[in-house]
């Protein structure tokens, strides 16, 4: 699968497929476009997981735990992406706030 095809999966809303497709590619190649695809697929996946984390059920807590792991990865990845607009850094900030509010809501 190519990076272009992965971005197409994202556009089609096939978040999990796109995320699962980029992971093995990113493990062996950290080029400009692969890194961007990894970043945006991880953002999509984190948003999906935060939507699942709604209560203290095992599924919700597992989703929240996975979202936290992805967030830490995004914090490491964002500075490596050439992003003159600052949208990657802003996205990480916004996701941090979303993660914090979800964590508070779920853990109450």
Indicate where each model-derived feature is located.
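Alpha-helical segment of the N-proximal tetratricopeptide repeat
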Residues: 1-21
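Amphipathic alpha-helical repeat scaffolds of TPR domains
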Residues: 1-4, 35-54, 86-105
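Inward-facing hydrophobic residues that define packing positions of alpha-helical scaffold repeats
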Residues: 10, 22, 64-67, 71
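Alpha-helical adaptor scaffolds
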Residues: 11, 26-40
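Alpha-helical junction/boundary sensor with strong preference for TPR arrays
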Residues: 28-30, 49, 56, 71-81
């Amino acid at each position: 699968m190519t990076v272009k095809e992965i971005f197409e999966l994202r556009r089609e809303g096939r978040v999990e497929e796109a995320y699962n497709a980029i992971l093995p590619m990113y493990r062996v190649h950290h080029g400009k476009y692969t890194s961007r695809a990894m970043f945006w697929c991880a953002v999509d996946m984190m948003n999906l997981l935060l939507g699942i984390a709604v209560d203290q059920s095992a599924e919700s807590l597992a989703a929240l735990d996975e979202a936290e792991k992805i967030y830490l990865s995004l914090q490491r990845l964002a500075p490596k992406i050439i992003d003159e607009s600052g949208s990657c850094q802003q996205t990480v900030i916004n996701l941090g706030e979303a993660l914090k509010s979800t964590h508070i809501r779920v853990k109450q």
